[in-house]
From Swiss-Prot:
GO molecular function: ADP binding; ATP binding; phosphoglycerate kinase activity
Species lineage: Bacteria, Bacillati, Bacillota, Bacilli, Bacillales
Listed name of the protein: Phosphoglycerate kinase
Subunit record text: Monomer.
Residues bearing PTM Phosphoserine: S183
Organism of origin: Geobacillus stearothermophilus
Binding site for substrate: D21, F22, N23, R36, H59, L60, G61, R62, R118, R151
Family annotation (SUPFAM superfamilies): Phosphoglycerate kinase
First-level EC class: transferase
Superkingdom to which the source organism belongs: Bacteria
């Protein structure tokens, strides 16, 4: 990684504006999963231990530039304080006189959490005035919010124009793991691409076909490829306007010598419900009024064998409608295969894949779970992430 990190700068006595990703799931004002808060702890602890005055900023949800009471960060400040075992002060604004006064009161090793930065319309517009106001609070900017690195917002990109800007440890790990996967992978290198829509994964499939040895396709997007092979897909998800593209991807795989794996059998249902009637059918025998909602047992075995023989696997997107237990077997089989394959380095690309390994209790068996769904997707598309570009080079 060629970006400076907090190790490369002296933080003692400095006011450090640290952008974190505390966008945690909430229900009735309570945090239901604190993974993202825990993920930022190494950076926050390092700053505390090295005598920084720590100013934390994050978004929560999508308030669209207005104050939304249930999206305030009070519950986050409380949970962070419990995890750090020290008080975390919190302001009701993210800029302004109240915030300046709170920053002035900070001693070395103190932690202050600003209010939800997306309460300000200027945040998502990357308004230079808001970015300047953030910058005026601090001497140094640290970005540890990989999950928001694909956004050019005031607190992720704009602020870096006005302060020295470096990466935190979480950002560093994400860039190192994903960067190595794309630039210098251990082989055989396998990508597993699932999820509902081809259109969301076009860039990823296109970029990965240049790099992988094996490409495994699953989830709703697989049926556009199945249709491209000339098979009927019944009422399964289908993007008619992407059939030609699917054909071209299969052609490209052949040209590049990439082994392209698709489902050989599927679990079909007569309606979209957990208690629907289901059966397993070969891929070329999906009944007209049924939908394929998961990969079948033969496909699970096939994919498991490919995983077992891989040195590196990047997984982005589930194999079926894993939220319904009846159609979770395919996704679970992938997670289990990765957990069991000890010689295989597993990178889970955030979003639904991360939620799936959590659901099956296998998160601790994965080598790297990305904290950014959209960010890891754009990184794997080969795009430059604005929040990363803005950081200082070593």
């Amino acid at each position: 990684m060629n970006k400076k990190t907090i190790r490369d700068v002296d933080v003692r006595g400095k006011r450090v504006f640290c952008r974190v990703d505390f966008n945690v799931p909430m229900e009735q004002g309570a945090i239901t999963d604190d993974t993202r808060i825990r993920a930022a702890l190494p950076t926050i602890r390092y700053l505390i231990e090295h005598g920084a005055k720590v100013i934390l900023a994050s978004h929560l949800g999508r308030p669209k530039g207005k104050v939304v009471e249930e999206l305030r960060l009070d519950a986050v400040a409380k949970r962070l304080g419990e995890l750090l075992e020290r008080p975390v002060a919190k302001t009701n604004e993210a800029v302004g006189d109240e915030v300046k006064a709170a920053v002035d009161r900070l001693n070395e090793g103190d932690v202050l959490l600003l209010e939800n930065v997306r309460f300000y319309p200027g945040e998502e517009k990357n308004d230079p005035e808001l970015a300047k106001a953030f910058a005026e609070l601090a001497d140094l900017y640290v970005n540890d919010a990989f999950g928001a690195a694909h956004r050019a917002h005031a607190s992720t990109e704009g602020i870096a124009h006005y302060l020295p800007a470096v990466a935190g440890f979480l950002m560093e790990k994400e860039l190192e793991v994903l960067g190595k996967a794309l630039s210098n992978p251990d082989r055989p290198f396998t990508a597993i691409i699932g999820g509902a829509k081809v259109k969301d994964k076009i860039g990823v499939i296109d970029n990965l076909l240049e790099k992988v040895d094996n490409l495994i396709i699953g989830g709703g997007l697989a049926y556009t490829f199945v249709k491209a092979l000339g098979h009927d897909v019944g009422k399964s998800l289908l993007e008619e306007d992407k059939i030609e593209l699917a054909k071209s991807f299969m052609e490209k795989a052949k040209e590049k010598g990439v082994r392209f794996y698709m489902p050989v059998d599927v679990v079909v249902a007569d309606r979209f419900a957990n208690d629907a009637n289901t059966k397993v059918v070969p891929i070329d025998a999906i009944p007209a009024d049924w939908s394929a909602l998961d990969i079948g047992p033969k496909t699970r075995e096939l994919y498991r064998d490919v995983i077992r023989e891989s040195k590196l696997v990047v997984w982005n997107g589930p194999m079926g409608v894993f939220e319904m237990d009846a159609f979770a077997h395919g996704t679970k089989a992938i997670a289990e295969a990765l957990a069991e394959a000890l010689d295989t380095y597993s990178v889970i690309g955030g979003g639904d894949s991360a939620a799936a390994v959590e659901k099956f209790g296998l998160a601790d068996k994965m080598d790297h779970i990305s904290t950014g769904g959209g960010a890891s997707l754009e990184f794997m598309e080969g795009k430059q992430l604005p929040g990363v570009v803005a950081l200082e080079d070593k």
